[in-house]
């Protein structure tokens, strides 16, 4: 049995990981907007791969330690 309950919103049931996903997506966009002006993407070999890895790391950190 999972320790996290299923969330019901307007008659639709969502798994708990869905809300962690939404929070991590929001945090990803904030971090991405902060990294854009720094010019870090000039040093990144593959920006899409970097963004995917950044999102995966944020999702893991929020799921494991945050929410």
Curated annotation (Swiss-Prot):
Belongs to the AaeX family. Its main location: membrane. This is Protein AaeX. It comes from Pectobacterium carotovorum subsp. carotovorum (strain PC1). The chain crosses the membrane at residues 10-30, 43-63. NCBIfam families: PRK11594.1. It comes from the Bacteria. It is a multi-pass membrane protein. It is found in: Cell membrane. The gene is aaeX. Signal peptide: none annotated. Keywords: Cell membrane, Membrane, Transmembrane, Transmembrane helix. GO terms for cellular component: plasma membrane.
């Amino acid at each position: 049995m999972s320790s996290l309950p299923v969330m019901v919103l307007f008659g639709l049931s969502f798994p708990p990981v869905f809300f962690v996903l939404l929070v991590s997506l929001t945090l990803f966009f904030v971090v991405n907007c902060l990294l854009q002006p720094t010019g870090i993407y000039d040093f990144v070999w593959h920006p899409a791969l970097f963004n995917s890895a950044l999102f995966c790391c944020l999702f893991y950190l929020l799921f494991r330690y945050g929410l």
